[in-house]
Curated annotation (Swiss-Prot):
Stretches the record annotates as G-loop: 778-784
Record protein name field: Phosphatidylinositol 4,5-bisphosphate 3-kinase catalytic subunit beta isoform
Role this protein plays: Phosphoinositide-3-kinase (PI3K) phosphorylates phosphatidylinositol (PI) derivatives at position 3 of the inositol ring to produce 3-phosphoinositides. Uses ATP and PtdIns(4,5)P2 (phosphatidylinositol 4,5-bisphosphate) to generate phosphatidylinositol 3,4,5-trisphosphate (PIP3). PIP3 plays a key role by recruiting PH domain-containing proteins to the membrane, including AKT1 and PDPK1, activating signaling cascades involved in cell growth, survival, proliferation, motility and morphology.
GO biological process, one term: phosphatidylinositol phosphate biosynthetic process
Principal EC category: transferase
EC number: 2.7.1.153, 2.7.11.1
Domain statement: The inhibitory interactions with PIK3R1 are mediated by the PI3K-ABD domain and the C2 PI3K-type domain with the iSH2 (inter-SH2) region of PIK3R1; the C2 PI3K-type domain, the PI3K helical domain, and the PI3K/PI4K kinase domain with the nSH2 (N-terminal SH2) region of PIK3R1; and the PI3K/PI4K kinase domain with the cSH2 (C-terminal SH2) region of PIK3R1. The inhibitory interaction between the PI3K-ABD domain and the C2 PI3K-type domain with the iSH2 (inter-SH2) region of PIK3R1 is weak. The nuclear localization signal (NLS) is required for its function in cell survival.
UniProt keyword terms in alphabetical order: ATP-binding, Autophagy, Cell adhesion, Cytoplasm, Endocytosis, Kinase, Lipid metabolism, Nucleotide-binding, Nucleus, Phosphoprotein, Transferase
Catalytic activity: a 1,2-diacyl-sn-glycero-3-phospho-(1D-myo-inositol-4,5-bisphosphate) + ATP = a 1,2-diacyl-sn-glycero-3-phospho-(1D-myo-inositol-3,4,5-trisphosphate) + ADP + H(+); 1-octadecanoyl-2-(5Z,8Z,11Z,14Z)-eicosatetraenoyl-sn-glycero-3-phospho-1D-myo-inositol 4,5-bisphosphate + ATP = 1-octadecanoyl-2-(5Z,8Z,11Z,14Z-eicosatetraenoyl)-sn-glycero-3-phospho-(1D-myo-inositol 3,4,5-triphosphate) + ADP + H(+); L-seryl-[protein] + ATP = O-phospho-L-seryl-[protein] + ADP + H(+)
Sites bearing Phosphoserine, chain numbering: 324, 1070
Gene Ontology cellular component annotations, sorted alphabetically: brush border membrane; cytoplasm; cytosol; nucleus; phosphatidylinositol 3-kinase complex; phosphatidylinositol 3-kinase complex, class IA; plasma membrane
Species per Swiss-Prot/TrEMBL record: Rattus norvegicus (Rat)
C-alpha cells in the first residue's frame, strides 16, 4: 500500500502541532492515526512524551480487537514509519526516541515490516540530521549533483577506511584534538608563581586532589608521573601504575592534554594562567579511552559495510570521440533570446533584457540589450544576441548574466508601476526613460565538465537586487536558478548547437603547451622585467590596499613586469590577476604557466585569492594549496569566511570544498563548526543543494560524530518549540506565570532528556550536563530569548550559561566577534595582551542560534542603577563602576582588576572604532567582577550608527566616558601616568591593526555574499579603509587616531546623555 495515498488531508492550521500550548497541558496527549499492514486504520490517544516502544506496545494491545489480526507477524518484526518535518519518509528504528522528539509532520504512524537495508537507514538518518532529505538530491536528476555525490561518497569512505588502522591515541587526536598556541607571550611569565605553573590533579573516582608547582615547559606525561608518585607517597604501595596508563582530561570538559607539546602551549592552560585560575585535571585511565575508541570502531566498520553495499555501479565506458577545443573556434559568441514568462508587468509596459559576459567582476565585452517589447504573460523576442568576443577567447569561468528591465516614460511612471516597487531597487534613467529592474539570473558559459553549453535552457530568475549593480547586471549573484520555478520569471535562451561534436575548454596540458608556444615565438615576453625606476613605481602600486582601483596604464605595467612581480613581490599576485586581459586566450595561457612557478603565499595573504574577483579554477586551486599550510587553530579562525566563499564557487566539485571536507574529517572540532555553518544556511534556496551535498559527504565520512550532532539538533528543536510556546503565551500570562510555564515544560522528561548531557554547539569541549531549571528564564526583548543555566557535575566547576535566540540573525554578531578574536590574536602576536573577551556565538538555523553567557558579569546600566536611587542621575555617577569593582576585589586583587579593566577598555575602544560598532549604550557594555570590560550585541557595524529624525544619536568614534577614566586612574583625578599608559596602549593597538589592514578588508570582502544587512557592497567596506587610514603614512594615521581619541574624550558628555535616556527608559519599562 502506498504511504502517500493514504495520508489524511493536511491540517488547515499551519502552526507546528508539536509547539502548541497543549504541550504543557496536564494530560499531554495527542490523537495519532495508526495504519496497519493489513489496511486497518486505528486511532488512539497517546502521550506526547511516550517512547516509540511504549506506543507500539499500546497499539499491539488494541490490534487484537480488530479484523485480520492473525495475518500479522510477531511485534518485533515491525517498526513505525512517518513523514518527518523535512518531508522525509523516516523509519523509526530507534524505539527509545520519544514521539515529541520524532515530530512527525502529521500525527500519523504507519506500521511497516522492519527494514534490513542498512544503506537506507543511514540515508534516512543523514537526511534528518542535515535538515534536508537525500531524496531531494536524487529527484533533481542533475548530472553534476550525481557526479559530485558519487565522488564525495568515495572520498568519505576512503577517510573512514583510514580510521580503521588508527591507534587509540591517534583516534583521540582526531576526535578530541588538543588546542595549541605555539607562540609564547612575554607577559605570561609575570602571571606564573616564581616562574612555575601550579596545577591541580585528581584521579577519576577519587576526591583526593594533588597540587604541583611545575615548569611550564614540562610535557603532560610528566604530570601523570608526579601524580602517581604523590598518590604512592600518601596511600602507600598499590597496584603498579605507569604514567602511560593515564591521560590528562580537563575537569568538566571533553578536552584532553597529551602529546609532546609543553604545558604552556595548551590553550586551556594558557587561559588559566592569563585569568589567574588554577588548571584542574582528572587522570583518566587509558582503558576508558580505549573503550570509547573500540565502540566508535564498531560503528565505523558497520558504516563501511553499509556504504560498500550501496555503492552505485560504475558507469559503462563511453565511446571515444573526437573532442574539439574552443581555442580553435574563432566565431563570435552568440545566443538566442527566445522568450520570457511571468514577468509580472502591465500589458502596456515595455520590457527589455540586458545581457553581459563576466569573469568575476570584469566585463569581458560590451553588454548586449534586446529590443523593447510589451506583452501580458509571455514576452516573445526570438532575437539573436551577439557579443563582441570570439568563442576562443572565452575564459573557463565566464558567466552569462541577464537582467530584465521594465522601461517607462518619466511622465507615465506614477500610473504604470502598480506591480513594480521603485523604492526597493535602484532605477536607471536613460534618454528620458526610467528603467526598473524586474528580475535577474546568471548561468555559466561552460558546464561542470568544461563543455561549452549548447541547446535550449530555461533560467528561472531572482527578483531581489543588490544595492550595487555592474552594468545594470548582478555578476556576483548565484549561478543557480531559482528553485521556486512556479512563481519565478523565466527566461528561455538558446545556446548555439554544436552539430558535429561538442566544444570543450582545453585541458591543463594544452594550456601549458600554448604558453610555451607563445614564449618561444616572442622573446620580449620572456624578459618582462624593468629597471630600478620601474621597480619603485611598481612597489608603490602594489603596496596599495585591496580596495584601490588600478588604472589601465598601471595594469599594463604590472602585466609587463610580471616576472619582476614573481621574483620581488610575490604578494602582488592578486593585483597581477586584476591586470590580465581575461578575454585574450594568449594572456590566460601565459598566466597559467607563470602560476606554476609562483612562490607559495602565506595563508593570510592567499585568502584574498578566494574573493569573487578571482574565479579562475587554477588560481583558486593555488590559493587552497597555500591554505594547506594553516594549522587547525588558524583554519578555525577563518572558517566562517571559507564557508561563505563556497557561494562564489560555480561548480560543486572544487578545491575549496574538498579541502574543507578533508580538514573537517581530520579534526572533529573543525567538523562541528563546518557542520553548523553549513546547516544554518541550508534553508537558503541559492545554496541549499551545494551546502546539502557537502553536509551529506561530511556525515558519511564521520559516522561517529553523527550521534553527537543529532543530539545537538534534537536539543535545538526542543528550544525552538519552547521559545514558540513562550511567544504564544507572552500576551496571555504575566512574567511570573510565563516563567513557571517555562519551568514546567523544562521539567518534562522529554525536555530533560533532550537538553541534558550534550556537547555544546558553541564549544565541543564543553558538556552541558544538566539544566538548573530554577535559574532558567526568558528575557524581555521582543524575540523572548531563552536564558539557560547548566549545572556542571565536574569537581569544583562553575555553572555554564547559554542564551538561545529564535527570530534574530546572529551572523553579523558572529562576524564581529570573529574580528575581535582576530584582533586579540594579532595583538598577542605583537606581544600586547589587551584581555579581550570575544564570547561564543553561533548561528544554528534560519534566524536562530546560541550565545555564550559570560559568568560573573553585569551591564554598566545595572551597575549604575544599583548604585543610585534615581534612574535619571545613575548614568552620571562616576564612582559607581569603581565602587562595584571594590565590592568584589581588594588589595592586590583590586589592582589586578583595574589593570584588567584598563587593558580591555583600550582593546574595545580601538576595536569599536576600527569596526565602526554602533548602538553603544550602557546595556551592551559589560564588566566582569575580575575587571574585564567587554561589548555585546553587534547589530550595527561599519559606521552604521543609529539616528533619529536624521540626527545621529552617537557622536563619538568610540566609548570613553569619565567613569571609565575614573577607574583607569584608580579613582585619583591627577593620575596622568595611568591614563597616559592607557592612551599609549590604544595607540599601539591601533597601529598593530593598521599593519594588518589588508587582512581585515579581505575578510569583510569574503563576507559580501553572506547577505548581512550592513555588508552588502564594497562601499560598506570603505569604512575600514578610512578608519585604518590605509591611504596615509603611519605618522598621518596615528595623528588621525589621536584626533579621534581626543574627540571621544571631549564629546563623552553626549554619551552620558544617551545613557541617561536609555537608563530612564529601561527603569520605566521594568
Amino acid at each position: 500500500m502506498c504511504f502517500r495515498s493514504i495520508m489524511p488531508p493536511a491540517m488547515a492550521d499551519t502552526l507546528d502541532i508539536w509547539a502548541v500550548d497543549s504541550q504543557i497541558a496536564s494530560d499531554g496527549s495527542i490523537s495519532v492515526d495508526f495504519l496497519l499492514p493489513t489496511g486497518i486504520y486505528i486511532q488512539l490517544e497517546v502521550p506526547r512524551e511516550a517512547t516509540i516502544s511504549y506506543i507500539k506496545q499500546m497499539l499491539w494491545k488494541q490490534v487484537h480487537n480488530y479484523p485480520m489480526f492473525n495475518l500479522l507477524m510477531d511485534i518485533d518484526s515491525y517498526m513505525f514509519a512517518c513523514v518527518n518535518q523535512t518531508a522525509v519518509y523516516e523509519e523509526l528504528e530507534d524505539e527509545t526516541r520519544r514521539l515529541c522528539d520524532v515530530r512527525p509532520f502529521l500525527p500519523v504512524l504507519k506500521l511497516v515490516t522492519r527494514s534490513c537495508d542498512p544503506a537506507e537507514k543511514l540515508d534516512s538518518k543523514i537526511g534528518v540530521l542535515i535538515g534536508k532529505g537525500l531524496h531531494e538530491f536524487d529527484a533533481l536528476k542533475d548530472p553534476e549533483v550525481n557526479e559530485f555525490r558519487r565522488k564525495m561518497r568515495k572520498f568519505s569512505e576512503d577517510k573512514i577506511q583510514s580510521l580503521v588502522g588508527l591507534s587509540w591515541i591517534d583516534w583521540l587526536k582526531h576526535t578530541y584534538p588538543p588546542e595549541h598556541e605555539p607562540s609564547v607571550l612575554e607577559n605570561l611569565e609575570d602571571k606564573l608563581y616564581g616562574g612555575k605553573l601550579v596545577v591541580a590533579v585528581h584521579f577519576e573516582n577519587s576526591q583526593d586532589v594533588f597540587s604541583f608547582q611545575v615548569s611550564p615547559n614540562l610535557n603532560p606525561i610528566k604530570i601523570n608521573e608526579l601524580a602517581i608518585q604523590k598518590r604512592l607517597t600518601i596511600r602507600g604501595k598499590e597496584e603498579e601504575a605507569s604514567p602511560c596508563d593515564y591521560v590528562l582530561q580537563v575537569s568538566g570538559r571533553v578536552e584532553y592534554v597529551f602529546g609532546d607539546h609543553p604545558l604552556i602551549q595548551f590553550q586551556y592552560i594558557r587561559n588559566c594562567v592569563m585569568n589567574r585560575t588554577l588548571p584542574h585535571f582528572i587522570l583518566v585511565e587509558c582503558c576508558k579511552i580505549k573503550k570509547m575508541y573500540e565502540q566508535e570502531m564498531i560503528a565505523i566498520e558497520a558504516a563501511i559495510n553499509r556504504n560498500s553495499s550501496s555503492l552505485p555501479l560504475p558507469l559503462p565506458p563511453k565511446k571515444t570521440r573526437v573532442i574539439s577545443h574552443v581555442w580553435g573556434n574563432n566565431n563570435p559568441f552568440q545566443i538566442v533570446l527566445v522568450k520570457g514568462n511571468k514577468l509580472n508587468t502591465e500589458e502596456t509596459v515595455k520590457v527589455h533584457v540586458r545581457a553581459g559576459l563576466f569573469h568575476g567582476t570584469e566585463l569581458l565585452c560590451k553588454t548586449v540589450v534586446s529590443s523593447e517589447i510589451s506583452g501580458k504573460n509571455d514576452h516573445i523576442w526570438n532575437e539573436q544576441l551577439e557579443f563582441d568576443i570570439n568563442i576562443c577567447d572565452l575564459p573557463r569561468m565566464a558567466r552569462l548574466c541577464f537582467a530584465v528591465y521594465a522601461v517607462l516614460d518619466k511622465v507615465k511612471t506614477k500610473k504604470s508601476t502598480k506591480t513594480i516597487n521603485p523604492s526597493k531597487y535602484q532605477t536607471i534613467r536613460k534618454a528620458g526613460k526610467v528603467h526598473y529592474p524586474v528580475a535577474w539570473v546568471n548561468t555559466m558559459v561552460f558546464d561542470f565538465k568544461g563543455q561549452l553549453r549548447s541547446g535550449d535552457v530555461i533560467l528561472h530568475s531572482w527578483s531581489s537586487f543588490p544595492d550595487e549593480l555592474e552594468e545594470m547586471l548582478n555578476p556576483m549573484g548565484t549561478v543557480q536558478t531559482n528553485p521556486y520555478a512556479e512563481n519565478a520569471t523565466a527566461l528561455h535562451i538558446k545556446f548555439p548547437e554544436n552539430k558535429k561534436q561538442p566544444y570543450y575548454y582545453p585541458p591543463f596540458d594544452k594550456i601549458i603547451e600554448k604558453a610555451a608556444e607563445i614564449a618561444s615565438g616572442d622573446s620580449a615576453n620572456v624578459s618582462s622585467r624593468g629597471g630600478k625606476k620601474f621597480l619603485a613605481v611598481l612597489k608603490e602600486i602594489l603596496d596599495r590596499d585591496p580596495l584601490s582601483q588600478l588604472c589601465e596604464n598601471e595594469m599594463d605595467l604590472i602585466w609587463t613586469l610580471r616576472q619582476d612581480c614573481r621574483e620581488n613581490f610575490p604578494q602582488s599576485l592578486p593585483k597581477l590577476l586584476l591586470s590580465i586581459k581575461w578575454n585574450k586566450l594568449e594572456d590566460v595561457a601565459q598566466l597559467q604557466a607563470l602560476l606554476q612557478i609562483w612562490p607559495k603565499l602565506p595563508p593570510r595573504e592567499a585568502l584574498e585569492l578566494l574573493d569573487f574577483n578571482y574565479p579562475d579554477q587554477y588560481v583558486r586551486e593555488y590559493a587552497v594549496g597555500c591554505l594547506r599550510q594553516m594549522s587547525d587553530e588558524e583554519l578555525s579562525q577563518y572558517l566562517l569566511q571559507l564557508v561563505q566563499v563556497l557561494k562564489y564557487e560555480p561548480f560543486l566539485d572544487c578545491a575549496l570544498s574538498r579541502f574543507l571536507l578533508e580538514r573537517a574529517l581530520d579534526n572533529r572540532r573543525i567538523g562541528q563548526f563546518l557542520f553548523w555553518h553549513l546547516r544554518s544556511e541550508v534553508h537558503t534556496p541559492a545554496v541549499s543543494i551545494q551546502f546539502g551535498v557537502i553536509l551529506e559527504a561530511y556525515c558519511r565520512g564521520s559516522v561517529g560524530h553523527m550521534k553527537v550532532l543529532s543530539k545537538q539538533v534534537e536539543a535545538l528543536n526542543k528550544l525552538k518549540t519552547l521559545n514558540s510556546l513562550i511567544k504564544l503565551n507572552a500576551m496571555k500570562l504575566n512574567r511570573a506565570k510565563g516563567k513557571e510555564a517555562m519551568h514546567t515544560c523544562l521539567k518534562q522528561s522529554a525536555y530533560r532528556e533532550a537538553l541534558s548531557d550534550l556537547q555544546s554547539p558553541l564549544n565541543p569541549c564543553v558538556i552541558l550536563s544538566e539544566l538548573y531549571v530554577e535559574k532558567c528564564r526568558y528575557m524581555d526583548s521582543k524575540m523572548k530569548p531563552l536564558w539557560l543555566v547548566y549545572s556542571n557535575r565536574a569537581f569544583g566547576e562553575d555553572a555554564v550559561g547559554v542564551i538561545f535566540k529564535n527570530g534574530d540573525d546572529l551572523r553579523q554578531d558572529m562576524l564581529t566577534l570573529q574580528m575581535l578574536r582576530l584582533m586579540d590574536l594579532l595583538w598577542k602576536e605583537a606581544g600586547l595582551d589587551l584581555r579581550m573577551l570575544p564570547y561564543g556565538c553561533l548561528a544554528t538555523g534560519d534566524r536562530s542560534g546560541l550565545i555564550e553567557v559570560v559568568s560573573t558579569s553585569e551591564t554598566i546600566a545595572d551597575i549604575q542603577l544599583n548604585s543610585s536611587n534615581v534612574a535619571a542621575t545613575a548614568a552620571f555617577n562616576k564612582d559607581a563602576l569603581l565602587n562595584w569593582l571594590k565590592e568584589y576585589n581588594s588589595g592586590d586583587d583590586l589592582d589586578r582588576a583595574i589593570e584588567e579593566f584598563t587593558l580591555s577598555c583600550a582593546g574595545y575602544c580601538v576595536a569599536s572604532y576600527v569596526l565602526g560598532i554602533g548602538d553603544r549604550h550602557s546595556d551592551n557594555i559589560m564588566v566582569k567582577k575580575t575587571g574585564q570590560l567587554f561589548h555585546i550585541d553587534f547589530g550595527h557595524i561599519l559606521g552604521n550608527f543609529k539616528s533619529k529624525f536624521g540626527i545621529k544619536r552617537e557622536r563619538v568614534p568610540f566609548i570613553l566616558t569619565y567613569d571609565f577614566i575614573h577607574v583607569i586612574q584608580q579613582g585619583k583625578t591627577g593620575n596622568t601616568e595611568k591614563f597616559g599608559r592607557f592612551r599609549q596602549c590604544c595607540e599601539d593597538a591601533y597601529l598593530i591593526l593598521r599593519r594588518h589592514g589588508n587582512l581585515f578588508i579581505t575578510l569583510f570582502a569574503l563576507m559580501l555574499t553572506a547577505g548581512l544587512p550592513e555588508l552588502t557592497s564594497v562601499k560598506d567596506i570603505q569604512y575600514l579603509k578610512d578608519s585604518l587610514a590605509l591611504g596615509k603614512s603611519e605618522e598621518e594615521a596615528l595623528k588621525q587616531f589621536k584626533q579621534k581619541f581626543d574627540e571621544a574624550l571631549r564629546e563623552s558628555w553626549t554619551t552620558k546623555v544617551n545613557w541617561m535616556a536609555h537608563t530612564v527608559r529601561k527603569d520605566y519599562r521594568s
